[in-house]
């Protein structure tokens, strides 16, 4: 990370896409996408997804590391080009507990991530706990971040410290996605970004963390990009001009969250304006969902009814029977909720792919289609971009390859934004 930031600060148009997903096909897609380049691949886990208690994935930080390393080994991706990051590391998961208890767990969270070899650590203590006022005083936020930083510094060995980096600050949206419809987005004011940096500098120095300050590479801000279930707020560079100008006077860059679904040109403009770390998550699993839905349509055309996977029906049954991951996010009317379940940009379906019934039906879908030849006309009908790539000779039409390539459509847009002189 330090090299990428240094090159950006030296004037090179360079950024990095942060892949925020625990889905094995998404991770495989990202690693295969840069397998034959010299690029680093940044893969991040969030605190609610992976923590010392297992998170909603059931993985602790060391488990997630081994999970990613296992996929890397399968595809031949070198570990030295992998960067593992932890996002929103702090009291996020324990906001309903008193601050003292939540911070105690947050310290253990940080230790677990650093001990597992995660080198990009987002210190986020911005959320109020059960006995806190709302919002928290910025100095309290910074001092809590310093406590977390001290835990990281105390856990890392000297070799790890060569690569260890920190991200501070937070964006407006809650981790995990918007729960309601958005109308507009508040762009972070440069004075607030400056205050975030100043308070963290004071707090770190109070705690004897002067050396750790040199490892702070980025500040999380809101540049004016967001999405909800049905709409996207696109980047407007003119609205963030003052914010972009301020960061130039510091040794840091910005990290932008929720950049999913922006245009290729928007990613390029964001990196130009020093939002050099672009986080993406739901757009990747949305592309995965599109690919599986497309393959299900092909299966309906090619496989006899009694042998089909029924994957779309199984997804509906599971999500309707177990609505915990989508109920409070989607519209209450049944017909509208079904549209959201299938097609929402926030892609709450991503939480259900590990479900045993859904996983088995997806496996059967792929097995069924592996046993037949996929007609080019059928691929053109349901996956036209992949049809073009087949015609160009850069893709072989297996179900697995079609899914991977569909996910990589998203990554191609980020590469355009993050890389100098790309077509």
Curated annotation (Swiss-Prot):
A Gene Ontology biological process term: phosphoenolpyruvate-dependent sugar phosphotransferase system
Family per record: Belongs to the GatZ/KbaZ family. GatZ subfamily.
UniProt pathway: Carbohydrate metabolism; D-tagatose 6-phosphate degradation; D-glyceraldehyde 3-phosphate and glycerone phosphate from D-tagatose 6-phosphate: step 2/2
Function: Component of the tagatose-1,6-bisphosphate aldolase GatYZ that is required for full activity and stability of the Y subunit. Could have a chaperone-like function for the proper and stable folding of GatY. When expressed alone, GatZ does not show any aldolase activity. Is involved in the catabolism of galactitol.
Superkingdom, taxonomy of origin: Bacteria
Key words of the record: Galactitol metabolism
Name of the encoding gene: gatZ
HAMAP family: Tagatose_aldol_GatZ (MF_01296)
Keyword Signal: no
GO CC terms in record: plasma membrane
Self-association state and partner proteins as the record states: Forms a complex with GatY.
Entry-linked InterPro entries: Aldolase_TIM, GatZ/KbaZ-like, GatZ_KbaZ_carbometab, TagBP_ald_GatZ
Protein name per the record: D-tagatose-1,6-bisphosphate aldolase subunit GatZ
Segments crossing the lipid bilayer: none
Coiled coil stretches, renumbered: none
The keyword Glycoprotein is annotated on this UniProt entry: no
